[in-house]
Amino acid sequence: MGHNSDKLYVTHSEHAAGSHTASSFGKRQETGKSEFQRLPFDCCALSLQPFKNPVAVISETKAGEAPRADVFDLLNIVPYIRKFKSNPVTGKPLETSQLIKLNFSRNAEGNLHDPITYKVFSPHIHIVFLKNTGNVFDMASLQLLAIKPKTWRDLVNDEPFKRKDIITIQDPENLAARDLREYDYVKKDLKVSEDELAGDPLRGINVDAAGGASKVLKMIAEKNKSGQSPAPTPSKIDDGKGQEKKEGVVAKRKVEQMAYNASNYSSGRAAASLTSTSLMPETKSERAMFDEEEYMFEELSRPTKDKERQKSKAYATITTNFGPLNVELHGDRAPKTVYNFVQLAKAGKYDNVVFHRLIPGFMVQGGDPTGTGRGGESYWGEPFRDEHGEKGAYKHDSRGVLSMANSGPRTNGSQFFFTFRPTPHLDGKHTVFGKLVGGEETLDKIERVNVRPGGDRPVRDIVIQGVTVLQDPFEAYQARLQARLARQDQSDAALKRRAEAQKEREKDRTTWLGTKLGEKGAVGKRRMEEDVGVGKYLKVGGEAGQRTTLDVVDYGVEKKKKKAGGFGDFSGW
């Protein structure tokens, strides 16, 4: 039959040669070739053992192919580079400065996994890392959460990256890239002897104690620049013999400062991203932030005592062609409205603006730069809310009340009016934000101006020549806030400034003879302590050399003393 030499089983020699055919032709084809061996993704490409301090070396690829890298253990690749100056896989020239530290994530069992989806890595997963951060991901996670949404940010530290920064470690569709038979050091049988390893500067370094692979890479880079070997980190405590003892300095731990306008509840983004697939995943809960202006308004309207509320008041002078109008602005009850008026006044928006509407016995209205009654914008460029419904809001209960003009709810702009009498029907419709405290005669003159027949426009122009802000509670608040933030600042520059200021104060408490003065108020404090001591029961005698005059003793009948209730003290002794 011509096949009587073929056996019905695979012989040992065929197994040893890596042949899977029983024919002599197949045997001859496989002669001289070793079996395909794939490097596991979690092993060093040089020692073939699981890595502890992984670093990557980017390999050159053909045009159109995705960039890829080989992974080594730091303590294995550095001695090899020092001896052969080449890449163990490709044989191309290589320096230690080209090593990239990788940040793998491990679960409780010690298995490598994706840091976002927690999917355990396997030989069938496309594993990549970002060149600029070194963080390792599953390519599917990176594609779904960073590339497809076009955010192009690292999923761990939010650093931006580009497509060229994505480097492949393992591609299941490209097995040849991890074939051990094609590695340069395998073909040429290149090794680092034990004697050379013993003399290597990294021998004996505890990488974890030195701060990880990044710290060792930094030490190597410094060595390459200076030409000196990095000093190994001692693994045991020195006995200190022959060395000068050094005092340890414990650095103060910086306290993470919370933003002054942070709320006591979270923004809800983490919960929303967990329950909604349309949102980007959020792994950190953050506090919601109050708007800075709204927070300022809340702080100014918080005081309840009259003395504290006076700090929230603003004062201004409205100069007209009829005379001045001095007003008090209620920043404690209508802070947003007062802030709008103060900022417009400081910006000169009311300069040369007329009071366009006058109704004797009712009110006079102005604040419209167009002079028509249909214009005027707020400080923010859009209408803002009313404040007549706030707790403790002022009412239209007297002459000279300063209130906001509007065309309906939440339509406040720049126009305002003064009342000529109590107008309670305007309560709940217009926000009262001030009152007249000086210049009543000016208001009387304005009220006596005639109006055009059939209308309410004054015959004679009533012009606002300017508004001068005499007291601004918002500036005072900002100054207090900046001072508080400066005291709470934990930056290096702030701490240095405080230390220098403390040193200057210490100098002021030292005389030119070198003696240090006591603490301020220490003498008075000591006297107070002496006054409340036992010595208060001792009567102080007269001056030295003077006799004390004895009182005349009355030998009459001794009066019965009433018993005092309670134990009392020793003052009667």
Curated annotation (Swiss-Prot):
May catalyze the cis-trans isomerization of proline imidic peptide bonds in oligopeptides thereby assisting the folding of proteins. May also function as a chaperone, playing a role in intracellular transport of proteins. May also have a protein ubiquitin ligase activity acting as an E3 ubiquitin protein ligase or as a ubiquitin-ubiquitin ligase promoting elongation of ubiquitin chains on proteins. Residues 37-119 form the U-box domain. GO terms for molecular function: peptidyl-prolyl cis-trans isomerase activity; ubiquitin protein ligase activity. This is Peptidyl-prolyl cis-trans isomerase-like 2. It is found in: Nucleus. GO terms for biological process: protein folding; protein ubiquitination. Signal peptide: none annotated. It comes from the Eukaryota. Residues 312-469 form the PPIase cyclophilin-type domain. Belongs to the cyclophilin-type PPIase family. PPIL2 subfamily. One of its GO terms (cellular component) is catalytic step 2 spliceosome. Pathway: Protein modification; protein ubiquitination. Its EC number is 2.3.2.27, 5.2.1.8. It catalyses: [protein]-peptidylproline (omega=180) = [protein]-peptidylproline (omega=0); S-ubiquitinyl-[E2 ubiquitin-conjugating enzyme]-L-cysteine + [acceptor protein]-L-lysine = [E2 ubiquitin-conjugating enzyme]-L-cysteine + N(6)-ubiquitinyl-[acceptor protein]-L-lysine. Keywords: Isomerase, Nucleus, Rotamase, Transferase, Ubl conjugation pathway. Residues 236-247, 489-510 have a biased composition (Basic and acidic residues). It comes from Cryptococcus neoformans var. neoformans serotype D (strain JEC21 / ATCC MYA-565). Residues 223-247, 489-515 are annotated as: Disordered. InterPro entries: Cyclophilin-like_dom_sf, Cyclophilin-type_PPIase_CS, Cyclophilin-type_PPIase_dom, Cyclophilin_A-like, PPIL2_U-box_dom, Ubox_domain, Znf_RING/FYVE/PHD.
